[in-house]
Every structure is written in C-alpha cells, then in structure tokens.
C-alpha cells in the first residue's frame, strides 16, 4: 500500500458529544467500548498525526434537524436516535443552542477541527 498526500486523507465520522462524551445521550450504550478502546484519545492522535504530516483531515458530522423527526420510515437505530434527540440541531442554517450540545464537537477536538484547514463535509443521517 502506498500512502501519500496526493490521494490519502483521514476521515473522522461523528466526533461529537452525543457519541464520545460521558454527558452524551448514547454514553450508556457506547461508553464502555469508547473507554476500553481509548477511542477519544486515538481519534485525537490520528488527527494530530495527519495534520503534523500535512495530510488532509475531513470530518463527517451526524446531524438531525426538526424536519428529520417526521420521517415515515426508519430502522431501529434511527428511531432510537430520534427518540433520544441524538445529534439534534435547531435548524440547518441555525447554530442556536449548538455550542456544547450533543451535536457539537467534543471540546478537545475543537482546536483541530476549527483550525481553518479541516474540511467539514455535509452531514450524514445514517
């Protein structure tokens, strides 16, 4: 495998409070695994290594907006995510209530994500 800056990047999915913080709504489900695997620390190490070696870093956030809660069909996990308001935001173009919410970045990642170099993709739903 040839890893080079021309065609290799790091993609981080869902580096958000609801998933990675002890205060997140899914902590009871994922917390033991996150701690055991040192997920938070390893994601940070990965982003720092990529940046220090000048590799692109992409973030794929998970957001739900009020309109998403009216979906007619959804799987078990999607239904649960809506019920516990996981990754909820007040609107597509609004940051009202975003800072520190479950949808916000984990605080320790903010300097790495909000550095003006990291590319944040459009949000995914599933």
Predicted regions and their residues:
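Glycine-rich oxoanion-binding loops at beta->alpha junctions
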Residues: 119-126
